From Swiss-Prot:
The gene is rtcA. It catalyses: a 3'-end 3'-phospho-ribonucleotide-RNA + ATP = a 3'-end 2',3'-cyclophospho-ribonucleotide-RNA + AMP + diphosphate. It comes from Salmonella typhimurium (strain LT2 / SGSC1412 / ATCC 700720). ATP binds at residues 103, 283-287. Pfam families: RTC, RTC_insert. Keywords: ATP-binding, Cytoplasm, Ligase, Nucleotide-binding. It is an enzyme of class 6 (ligase). This is RNA 3'-terminal phosphate cyclase. PANTHER family: RNA 3' TERMINAL PHOSPHATE CYCLASE (PTHR11096), RNA 3'-TERMINAL PHOSPHATE CYCLASE (PTHR11096:SF0). CDD domains: RNA_Cyclase_Class_II. One of its GO terms (molecular function) is RNA-3'-phosphate cyclase activity.
Length: 339
């Protein structure tokens, strides 16, 4: 029997990424794990609906044996079985992030016995999670360069607190994974500001993109009033397309925060990214660790080595025979993986 990997959910930044990475890697490698202190670093520790849905989705996709899969649980034992391609549908039952559930199971389905379609219902545009736009426009084009055939479609927008959104991904097994090197982003080719509005006055989006335009005069502007009762909700993004990759920075409207303040938050993140020669933004760096580890080679530059990034690296190295280096440079960090 494979050895059980013991993980401390309180290590590093103590968030849900430790659990999601462990589930992905356990399915792929066949190694069981047990985790204590799940999300110990959060205000509400233990499994929330989003995390529980990820656990149950992983369980269904590989026929795992699992203990501790209940709301609020801070202990989990997961023993995987073989990964099975097919049609899957999961509902979070709240505005929890569809994208984080998808990012838990999709890496395993790169190694399935056939093609798959996974549909998840919940939130598609959430605080502290990659949006559907980020997955489609930023992450998946980079995965394609690594030899991964995966396409996500946004079915319906869903915002906190109502949820009600949905996204689906079609994924094919990968014959092999290629490494990816992102040292320089190259010249900026195009910048696009987009405000999404669901049951929110149109002038809010107009003010948001106007504020972004003051920071980025060259940006194209787009205000989208969503139909179909998917609100209330408001998401503002700035997409920066460069020669080597696309980045996307987002913020969300909340009651009591002005449209201008939301836009200035996006502008601050984007300006900080552009002020550094690093190719990859802080959040994208987190999303690249697992696919690069599975490829066994690759490198990228990032302005800041966050606790989230370092924690994810530590979890990956428990499951895979790879080693990451994180070397300080004059303008940030060079992150490399080798087997």
């Amino acid at each position: 029997m494979a050895r059980i990997i013991a993980l401390d959910g309180a290590q590093g930044e103590g968030g849900g990424q430790i659990l999601r990475s462990a589930l992905s890697l356990s399915m792929i490698t066949g190694q069981p794990f047990e985790m204590s202190g799940i999300r110990a670093g959060r205000a509400k520790p233990g499994l929330l609906r989003q995390h529980l849905t990820a656990v149950r989705a992983a369980t269904e996709i590989c026929g795992a044996q699992v203990n501790g899969d209940e709301l609020g649980s801070q202990q989990l034992r997961f023993t995987p079985g073989p990964i099975r391609g097919g049609e899957y549908r999961f509902a979070i039952g709240s505005a929890g992030s569809c994208m984080l559930v998808l990012q838990t199971v999709l890496p395993a389905l790169w190694f399935a016995d056939g093609s798959s379609r996974v549909e998840v219902h919940g939130g598609t545009h959430n605080q502290a999670a990659p949006s559907a736009d980020f997955i489609c426009r930023v992450w998946e084009p980079l995965l394609a360069r690594m030899g991964i055939s995966q396409r996500t479609t946004l079915i319906k927008h869903g915002f906190y607190p109502a949820g009600g959104g949905a996204a689906a991904t079609v994924v094919e097994p990968a014959a092999s994974l290629r490494g990816l090197t992102l040292i320089s982003r190259g010249e900026t080719l195009r910048t696009t500001a987009e405000a999404l509005l669901a049951a929110v006055p149109y002038h809010v989006g107009e003010r948001e993109v106007a504020t972004l335009e003051a920071h980025f005069p060259q940006a194209e502007k787009n205000v989208v009033a969503l139909e179909g009762g998917c609100g209330p909700g408001n998401a503002l993004s700035l997409m920066i397309q460069s020669e080597q990759l696309t980045e996307l920075f987002a913020a969300f409207g909340v009651k009591g925060t002005s449209a201008e303040a939301v836009a200035n938050q996006v502008a601050h993140e984007a300006r900080r990214y552009l002020a550094s020669p690093a190719a990859v933004g802080e959040h994208l760096a987190d999303q690249l660790i697992l696919p690069l580890a599975l490829a066994g080679e690759g490198a990228f530059t990032v302005a800041r080595a966050s606790a989230h990034l370092l924690t994810n690296i530590a979890v990956v190295e428990r499951f895979l025979p790879v080693r990451f280096s994180c070397e300080a440079t004059e303008s940030g960090y060079l992150v490399r993986v080798s087997d």
